[in-house]
Amino acid sequence: MNTAGNNWEEFDYFPDGREQKALRKDFTFNDFQDALEFVNKVGELAEKAGHHPDINLSWGLVRVWLTTHSKHKITDKDHNLAKAIDQL
């Protein structure tokens, strides 16, 4: 596990059964509603970027995974979306 800047961590990730690298970051919130609103904002950024993260939503916690599935690795698209998410 390596830090990839801005508290994003690099992990091995198996979203479709194949190993690849991904950036991951957890975001904490006061309640489910705040977490859901954040997920919706991330979704808007993802649509604009044409690059879609994997997102886990639970009470007060959002976990975001960024990887470029077609390349099976972390690319500039992931780093750029991570920076945009950090600005929310």
Regions found by a protein language model. Name each.
Residues 2-36, 40-61, 65-88:
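Long, contiguous binding/interaction regions
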